[in-house]
C-alpha cells in the first residue's frame, strides 16, 4: 500500500577506480552518508509512519545503482484503513530522490560561502538563493533538507570518499537532477552548512497536535508526533 520506487545512480571516477585497485570499503563512507541524508530528509518532508531506504541493485567498479523506496509502515497502513482515508504520500520516492540530489547540488553551488540568502518566491513555489550576483532556484523540499542540521551534515559527508587517493570525482543522478563534485571542491562543499533566510512571505499551516507540555516563561512545547515538535510562547491579546 502506498509504496513508491525510484533509482539513484552514484558513480566514483579516478585512476584507482579505473585500474580496479580501489577497495569498495573506501567508498562506503559516502554511500552510507547518502543513506543517512535520505533518512533525515524523509523525516522532514513526510509524516510519521512513512519510511524511506536505499538498496544496492547493481554495483560495478565505482558505479552503484541504488533503489530508493518509500513506504508506509504496517502500523500506518492499519491506521489508514481504520480511518477509511489513505492520503497520498506527500513526497514519494521520485520526488524525494530529486530533492536529495538538489541539496547536494546546492551545497556545491554555494562554494562554502556563508553570505548567501534564501527568499521564498510564490511564483515558482520554491526558494531563490542569492550569493553575490548569482541566483539559484531550489524546491521547498531541498530548502527544508539543507536547513536541517542532521540532513545538512549527512549531505556534507557524501564527499568523504573524495579524500581517498585516486578518487577524483563523484557523480549522483536521480531522474530529474544531477550532481557532480571533483575532489578539489570537497572542502568548500563540506563548509556549505548554513545560509540566512530573508523572506517577508507568511506561510500558514494547519497542524494536528499530538501532545503539549508547559515550560517556563509561558512557553509550550508542542509535539506533532515522533519526529516533529516546536516551542510556542503564549501572549496576552
Positions of predicted regions on the chain:
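Long, positively charged binding patches that form subdomain-scale interaction surfaces
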Residues: 132-236
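Protein-protein interaction interfaces in oligomeric scaffolds
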Residues: 1-126, 130-133, 137, 141
Amino acid at each position: 500500500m502506498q509504496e513508491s520506487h525510484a533509482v539513484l545512480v552514484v558513480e566514483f571516477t579516478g585512476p584507482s577506480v579505473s585500474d580496479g585497485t580501489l577497495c569498495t570499503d573506501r567508498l562506503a563512507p559516502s554511500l552510507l552518508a547518502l543513506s543517512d541524508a535520505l533518512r533525515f530528509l524523509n523525516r522532514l518532508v513526510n509524516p510519521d509512519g512513512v519510511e524511506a531506504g536505499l538498496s544496492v541493485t547493481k554495483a560495478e567498479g565505482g558505479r552503484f545503482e541504488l533503489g530508493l523506496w518509500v513506504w508506509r509502515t504496517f502500523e500506518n497502513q492499519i491506521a489508514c484503513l481504520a480511518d477509511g482515508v489513505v492520503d497520498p504520500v506527500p513526497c514519494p520516492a521520485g520526488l524525494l530522490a530529486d530533492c536529495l540530489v538538489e541539496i547536494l547540488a546546492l551545497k556545491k553551488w554555494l562554494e562554502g560561502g556563508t553570505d548567501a540568502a534564501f527568499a521564498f518566491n510564490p511564483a515558482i513555489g520554491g526558494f531563490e538563493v542569492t550569493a553575490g550576483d548569482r541566483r539559484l532556484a531550489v524546491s521547498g523540499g531541498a530548502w527544508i533538507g539543507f536547513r536541517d542540521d542532521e540532513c545538512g551534515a549527512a549531505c556534507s559527508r557524501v564527499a568523504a570518499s573524495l579524500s581517498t587517493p585516486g578518487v577524483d570525482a563523484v557523480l549522483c543522478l536521480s531522474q530529474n537532477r544531477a550532481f557532480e563534485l571533483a575532489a578539489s571542491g570537497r572542502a568548500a562543499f563540506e563548509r556549505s552548512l548554513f545560509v540566512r533566510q530573508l523572506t517577508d512571505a507568511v506561510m500558514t499551516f494547519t497542524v494536528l497536535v499530538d501532545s503539549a507540555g508547559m515550560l517556563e516563561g509561558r512557553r509550550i512545547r508542542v509535539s506533532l508526533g515522533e519526529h516533529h515538535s516546536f516551542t510556542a510562547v503564549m501572549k496576552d491579546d
